[in-house]
Amino acid sequence: MGISKMTLPERSLLFAKLASIAYNDNIKEVKKQAKSLGFTTVEFYNKEGAQAYRFQNKEDLVIACRGTEPTQFNDIAADLKAAPVKSESASRVHRGFKAEVDELWPMVLEDITRTVNKDNKLWFCGHSLGAAMATVMASRCFYEDSIRDAEELYTYGSPRVGWPGYVKTMQTKHHRWVNNNDIVTTVPPWLIGYKHDGEEHYLNAYGNVRKPTRWQRFKDKLRGLWMGIKRGQVDSFSDHSMVNYINYLEMYAKGKENSQS
């Protein structure tokens, strides 16, 4: 079954798993995991610390960008380079995120142009830094005459990527998942001009999908912080874990909820 025929919960879980797999360096394991999810072709991109995978079958092509690795200096440097620079479209984008994509884009663009046929659909996903990279890549598709536009973009724990003018140019449908107090979703700060893109899907302190008011969200964040303290965890960091995103999205895909809320 093609991705476009899946429900939103099913797609959200699939892309979360692919975004998680993108952290794996063992190509043999990655191919095995990808096959279990229905993908027959796997390609790894790696240049100057910027990394992504291409997962492909007869119907779909997915670019999954790898997120921040604490042991990789380039990843940390990319996160810290928050100064905005001119984008390919309009307004300004995060300097570090753009630089990471600049490293990989020629290879990714060449492969997409070469391998995508009229029956293939193009998708992007990523977690953390990978979410930001996937956002920048998806936005570039609209300005490339040689390839089709991306179907949709799925991100998990994404930082803000660009200024409002940049966000307005985004043509790809963006499903942006946020887990309660995930600290990465709060940076770079809006005070220096950055804005989130896409439709937010919020997971509350119990891992259930909600659309809270500002007041409800404030209370839910306090609840999450208190629950983290009781577990001996820093909630802002544990909520960024891809494991938690996947666990909650598995419940969502099954139509289940945590009974506490």
Model-assigned labels for residue ranges:
Residues M1-C125, L129-S261:
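Non-catalytic, mobile gating and regulatory segments of ester bond hydrolases
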